[in-house]
A protein has these predicted regions:
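Nucleic-acid-binding surface
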Residues: 3-31, 37, 42, 50, ...
Length: 204
């Protein structure tokens, strides 16, 4: 009887994690799965821990954007931006080895995270402007929209390189078939319209 109960408990835990892809310990606890039991499943080889407080099925093929999902699980208030957002939007040819995330000026930042992070701090995150949501491996991802990503590439051009910003701008204008209204609107919010104007006119 006890063995059957354990099997049912294990099946319940694995089913929850399979559904989510990457599951957080606190969500699993809320669903009735204790952290101590999750540790046991890790020791048995049934689960893996991609990061502290996160669990996935052992041997599960990671989805595209897996490391971004892990990073967003660690820094849940962060916004994926710049090179990592370009990658998710398929703009340009950048393949960053770090996950670029925007966080508040005084926000908590992890020490020795499970994935390499490049955190950009800002006093005003402008969370209501050009921020989208996706779900990867069951984790909610917040990321800058294509237009905001391009604008921020120009804002941080001294860090990432002007060539990266120009490549992304050209591809976005081509994708939008020359329509730049949203791009201009966001450029004004970030006071980048004068910087971007000559490049926009040349690329249009």
């Amino acid at each position: 009887m006890a063995v059957h109960a354990q099997d049912t408990k294990k099946a319940h835990a694995l089913r929850l994690i399979k559904r989510q892809g990457i599951a957080r310990a606190r969500d699993l606890e809320a669903a009735g799965v204790a952290v101590a039991y999750l540790r046991r499943l890790v020791e048995e080889g049934a689960l893996e821990q991609p990061a502290r407080g996160q669990y996935r099925l052992a041997g599960a093929a990671p989805a595209a954007g897996h490391t971004i999902a892990v990073a967003s699980g660690i820094v849940s208030q962060g916004i994926v931006c710049l090179l990592s957002a370009l990658r998710l939007h398929n703009l340009g040819t950048q393949t960053p080895h770090e996950i670029w995330m925007l966080i508040g000026a005084k926000a908590w930042a992890p020490v020795n995270p499970a994935v390499p992070l490049r955190l950009i701090r800002s006093r005003n995150l402008h969370e209501g402007i050009g921020v989208e949501e996706r779900t990867i491996e069951g984790v909610r991802i917040r990321l800058t929209s294509p237009e905001r990503t391009v604008v921020e590439c120009f804002k941080h051009r001294n860090t990432i390189g002007l060539d990266v910003a120009l490549e992304a701008l050209r591809e976005l204008i081509k994708r939008r078939r020359g329509k730049t209204d949203d791009l201009w609107r966001i450029a004004k919010v970030f006071r980048m319209q004068n910087v971007m104007r000559p490049y926009l006119e040349a690329a249009a």
